[in-house]
Every structure is written in structure tokens, then in C-alpha cells.
Amino acid sequence: MTITIGQYVEKRGLFDNVDDWLRRERFVFVGWSGLLLFPCAYMALGGWLTGTTFVTSWYTHGLATSYLEGCNFLTAAVSTPANSMAHSLLFLWGPEAQGDLTRWFQLGGLWPFVALHGAFSLIGFMLRQFEIAQSLKLRPYNAIAFSAPIAVFVSVFLIYPLGQAGWFFAPSFGVAAIFRFILFFQGFHNWTLNPFHMMGVAGVLGAALLCAIHGATVENTLFEDGDGANTFRAFNPTQAEETYSMVTANRFWSQIFGVAFSNKRWLHFFMLFVPVTGLWMSAIGVVGLALNLRAYDFVSQEIRAAEDPEFETFYTKNILLNEGIRAWMAAQDQPHEKLTFPEEVLPRGNAL
């Protein structure tokens, strides 16, 4: 009888080799999520830079939106396709552009290109956080938190225009273009009086307040265990023990408010919960606007204001402002509709 002693060699296929290469430790981690993140982010950023550099919006909005036409960083944009394109994905090889790059630019094909690649790159970045957290045996709360800005992006740039007549009514990708969209949201949807917007504002501003308070409190209660009390010199960045006193911080805020967080887990969960919930509420509200759901209507005040010239509230004043936005903006914003309004309904200075 012959006994062969040898070392067992595990059979490794193509998938194992690719997995090893993708997940190898390197300066910039790639991972499986990188197969989605890096190409999509490259395409989205490249499309935006291309559009803002030399692509006009004359054929879709009657506007100049590129550096070549005289715009600057704040006024340049990749604008939405023409209203006649409805919800077409506007593929370069599709029936609209028929493979003609110049025609594709003129029709607004860069906008769905940037929007869809941008959405998938954000999703890829969230999956990247999941993947790295899993490899380091961490909880996935970073990825869960990042779902909030993804929800806002998808709801504003994709779901809202899907509920409207076409991509034309989505925000264009530019600073001044986003400001115009905010005014549009207010005038046509009374967005500031929407309870979901209120929850979003409370979440974002509340998170900023919590962040400032938390950072200041930690700085206030740092241990002076190095070569001086200087924040940037007193501590070894690799020391194992904590560098601030939770007990002292608890005592301080108990004296200030009468209540304070008693443990770090609840404190940091609250700092996670407030902004994420606020952004998710905003996203839900925008989905409602896609379906043209209305905000609060205080009809009794409107009726009384119409009957009594001396009765006016901030609400009725805002309703008049919204009407002015709609009357003025509709003709400016949708030139293809050739909208005309009688002179008496158009806003004139401060007299609405």
C-alpha cells in the first residue's frame, strides 16, 4: 500500500482571483462596489464638466448655460431636456439623437446621462461603505446614514419629474439652476408650508446644532495629558484611552438644561437619527409633490382676506407671492408654451 503525503491545494476559479484583486489592500480600495462607483462617478462628473463647458441650452430652455457662452461657475448648468422629450432616456443611439452627438447635446441628452450615472454612483458609494464595514467587522451605520442624501437625490431629480410631464421639470445641474428650481417649488407647490419640508429643515438645522454642541463639549472636556493644554499638541493620536470626560460633560449639560445624555451610544445614535430622519422626511415630501399633493391650505384665512381688505396674515401674503411667482415664472420658464397673461395679473414691483 502506498501513502502519498502532500499539501492540499484549494482550487481557485476566476471569481476567487477577481475577488482577491478587487478587495486587496491598496491606497484606494476598489472592491466590488467600485465596479459600479468609479465608472458611474467618472461618467457623471465628466458629463457635467462637458455640459457646463460648451453645451448650450438655447434649444431646450432658450438659455445660455456654458462657459463658452459667457456663464461663470454659479450660472453654468447642465439643463434638463426639452419638454417635448417627456420621459425619454435620450440614449445617444436612440430615435431622438440617432447617434449624432451634436444633436444629442442640443436635445438635452446630457441631463439624463448625468442624473442616472450620478444616482448609480451614489448607490455605489453607499455599497462601498457597506463593503468596507463588512471587511473590517464594523456595523453598517455609515451606509445607512448615506441612504438619506441618496433618497433626497433620487426623489428630487428622478421621482419628481417622473410624476410631472417630463424631465424638463427636474432641477438642472447648476447652482443658479437649483435656486430657480427652489423658487419654482415654492410658487407651484407652496413647499415651505409642507410639513415634510418642515421636518427636513428641523432635521438639518437640528443636526448642525447637535454637531456644534457635541464638538464644543468634547473640546471643553479634553484631558490635559500631554505636553500642554493645546488641542493640537496635547494628545497622542494613537493613545488607547478616551481623551475626554463624559462624566464632566454630563454634569455640565445637566446644570445647563437639567437633562443630559448619560451614555455615548445614545448620544451618537441621536446625532445619526436627527439628520437622517429629516432628509428622509424631505424625500417623502418631494415624492408627494411628484403626485401634486398639496401642503397646508388655510382656506378660511384666504376667504376672509378676499372679503375684508384690512385682514391679512403672513399666510395670505405668501399665497399672493406664490401667485406672482406662477404668473411671472410660467411664461419665463416654459417659453415653448407661449403663455400670455393679462397685464393686470402680472406682479408689478412690491404691489401684488
Curated annotation (Swiss-Prot):
Q: What is its main location?
A: plastid
Q: How does it assemble?
A: PSII is composed of 1 copy each of membrane proteins PsbA, PsbB, PsbC, PsbD, PsbE, PsbF, PsbH, PsbI, PsbJ, PsbK, PsbL, PsbM, PsbT, PsbX, PsbY, PsbZ, Psb30/Ycf12, at least 3 peripheral proteins of the oxygen-evolving complex and a large number of cofactors. It forms dimeric complexes.
Q: Which UniProt keywords apply?
A: Acetylation, Chlorophyll, Chloroplast, Chromophore, Electron transport, Iron, Magnesium, Membrane, Metal-binding, Oxidoreductase, Phosphoprotein, Photosynthesis, Photosystem II, Plastid, Thylakoid, Transmembrane, Transmembrane helix, Transport
> In the UniProt entry for this protein, what further remark is given in the free-text comments?
2 of the reaction center chlorophylls (ChlD1 and ChlD2) are entirely coordinated by water.
Gene3D superfamilies found in the cross-reference section: Photosystem II protein D1-like (1.20.85.10)
- Reported EC number(s) for this entry are 1.10.3.9
Family according to the record: Belongs to the reaction center PufL/M/PsbA/D family.
GO molecular function: any one?
A: chlorophyll binding
Where, in this chain's numbering, is Fe cation bound?
H214, H268
Q: Record-annotated residues binding chlorophyll a ChlzD2?
A: H117
Annotated positions binding pheophytin a: Q129, N142
Identification of the protein by name: Photosystem II D2 protein
The keyword GTP-binding is annotated on this UniProt entry: no
What is the annotated signal peptide range for this record?
Answer: none
Q: Where does a plastoquinone bind?
A: H214, F261
Q: Source organism's superkingdom?
A: Eukaryota
Residue ranges annotated as transmembrane are: 40-60, 124-140, 152-165, 207-227, 278-294
Residue positions annotated to bind chlorophyll a PD2 are H197
Places the protein is found: Plastid, Chloroplast thylakoid membrane
Q: Which residues get modified to Phosphothreonine?
A: T2
Annotated GO biological processes are:
photosynthetic electron transport in photosystem II
